[in-house]
Amino acid sequence: MTVATYEVEKQFLTYVKKIENYGEALSLMFWDLRTGAPKQGVDQRSEVIGMLSSEVFVMSTSDEMGNYLTELESLIVENKLSETTKKMVEECRKEYDRNKKIPQAEYEAYVKLEAKAESVWEEAREKSDFEMFRPYLEKIVEFKKKFITYWGYETYKYNTLLDMYEPGITVEVLDHVFGQLRERIVPLVKEISESKKELKTNALSEHFSKEKQKNFTLELLKQLNYNFEAGRLDETVHPFEITLNRGDVRITTRYDEKDFRMAVFGTIHECGHAVYEQNVAEELEGTPLCSGTSMGIHESQSLFFENFIGRNKSFWKKNYDLLKRYSDGQFDGVSVDEFYDAINESKPSFIRIEADELTYPLHVMVRYELEKELFDGTLQVKDLPAAWNDKMETYLGIRPENDAQGVLQDVHWAGGSFGYFPSYALGYMYAAQFKHRMLKDIPNFDALLEEGNVTPIREWLTENIHQYGKTKKPLEILKDVTGEGLNANYLADYLEAKYKEIYEL
């Protein structure tokens, strides 16, 4: 490497690090907004977030950034850069080209709107009043449609949004794999509804104090390899994980004293996200590569933890006595087998994050269909509540009674995250495929859970997935780890085997 090459690379890395530092400050502000910032400070905080986001936007689309990218791309051709820097240039170029097409004033207005919209959504959800939130959502959708015209699209406008969260995934791919999954899930849901087996679920809805739930979930987090030296657990309306840096990865949860599953499984889910972020390779710190490679791969890790670990019978053989010690005595007459069946009960429900493993993908499909229709122009925002309710009835056979139970339950649209929801189902499919491959290397998977030893499992995930951050694309990771492309049958096989055993079908 020549002195000139070294200098331009060094200057570029310093410039990018400044952008990442602004991003860390923004993450801290978003975390604060959603974990208890005073209501009267929301408008000013939104102003600050808008200003800092605008600064990041300006830096990422500046002539200086453009010059760095052009110069470094010529060095890539001459093979004079490290692999990590090459990947960073590719990542920054993608963001540069995307953001350069959006006028700065429009971007700043959008970010301010988004910050305010999340607070309005929260209040609208509490009051179950979609009309309160509708004007904000209409503006967000309007902005997104305008942005798509700037970015361009292939075949479907929605494909552009999907690519932001899951490169390589399109409407055509999703229609195919969702169709495959639906063909096998829907008949199984019907079989279960006709099953005579009754699960003992009463204990799940008995009083379980918030403080005891918190202490129990803290114990589980330690067992699951969540590093409290590099994170913390807080309370919020809608659980999430947020990364400030790989040494500060925070998770939040929500407690319901009449249903402990919300906190326990929600926390395990967010733990999967956090463990991913905490175990990205250290040398990627301070670069745009120091995070999960896509939303789908990220969800594969959270769902792997929540379902393949947290809803596994062996996990509860280890932790059931611990649960009993923390609870208020409601599980004293319930065996671990009965408890396992109960927490895996399958029946249609209104709330996505409370859905069981089997019906969960159907919740995602509802949102996917609505988003497609919003962006192909066949559905208007004002008609969302009715359209939501109709699709819930079609897919799950139930109809929400109010907006909080229906269209207002998720924060994603308030944050402009259209194209994100399919990642949940993709993540589920990825996770099942990873688990199938992992068993070849760790055939004693269940025995490890029964011992409370999650470390070998976490280490396998780190070695094969976590450490790479964004240096590998999602479908590249899937192919490298499993030796094949996306295959929905692994998830369908897992669900059929599990639920036929539980319901004795």
PLM ranges: what are they?
Residues 2-4, 8, 40, 44, ...:
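C-terminal, non-catalytic "cap/extension" segments appended to globular domains
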Residues 291-332:
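Post-HExxH zinc-binding segment in Zn-dependent metallohydrolases
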Residues 229, 283-287, 311-321, 381-382, ...:
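Acidic/polar loop patches that form or flank catalytic/metal-binding clefts of enzymes
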Residues 262-281, 299-303:
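Active-site recognition of the HExxH zinc-binding catalytic motif
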